[in-house]
C-alpha cells in the first residue's frame, strides 16, 4: 500500500463508519463461531497484515494477539496494547516471526487482494492453525468494481464468494461460513466505485470521515448486519467474509 493510504487510515480508523461497523461484525463472528466453541478462557490469535492496528483492540478482547505487518511506517504507528505483540511479517514467505507457532484463530482482513500469490498465502497460513482452529478472512468483492480505489490500495484483484470459497477449499480448508457483508449499503458503494472511474487517479470516494450525522447513520445501518451474521448468508455485498476450519 502507498504511504498516503496508511496515513489516511490512521486518521479515520477509529471513527469512520466502515472501520467501526466492520470491526463490530467481525467481533460478532468471533464471539459466536470461535470463542464460544472453545473451553479456553483466552484464544491465541494471529493477524497477518494488521496495517495500522485498527482491528487489534477488538481481537484482544478474545485473547493474546500476535500481529504481523510488512510496512515499517504502519507497524511503527501501532500504539502499545496489553496482550498484543507486533512483528514484521508478510505472506506468503515472511512468517519467520511465528515459525513453529500455531494459533486458535488466524485472521486475514482485506489482505489477500494485496498478495499476488494468493493460493501460496493461504497454504502458508495452514501451517499456523492448531487442530480445530479457525481461519477468518475478508476480501473486497466483485472484479467489476475494481478501479481507482483498488489501485490506490495496491490490490491485485477482487473476489466473488464462489471464487473465494473454492480458493480456500483447494488449499485444504473446510468452509464453515461464507457470505457477504456491507450488503445494506452496497448500492451506494457500487455507485461510489463507478463514480471513481470519472475522477482523477489520485482520489477515491468515501475515504474521508463523513459529517457526524451521516457517519452515525451509515454506522447504524452497517451494524444492523450483526443481527444475521454469521447465521444467514446474504448473496451480495461490498466484502466477502469466510470462516474456515483446518
Regions from the language model: what does each represent?
Residues 1-101, 105-109, 119-122, 210-212, ...:
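Conserved N-terminal segment of class I S-adenosyl-L-methionine
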Residues 119-134:
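A short glycine-rich, Lys/Arg-flanked "PGG" loop and its adjoining helix->strand segment in the class I
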Residues 74, 143-145, 184:
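Feature marks short, surface-exposed loop/turn motifs that line or immediately flank catalytic pockets
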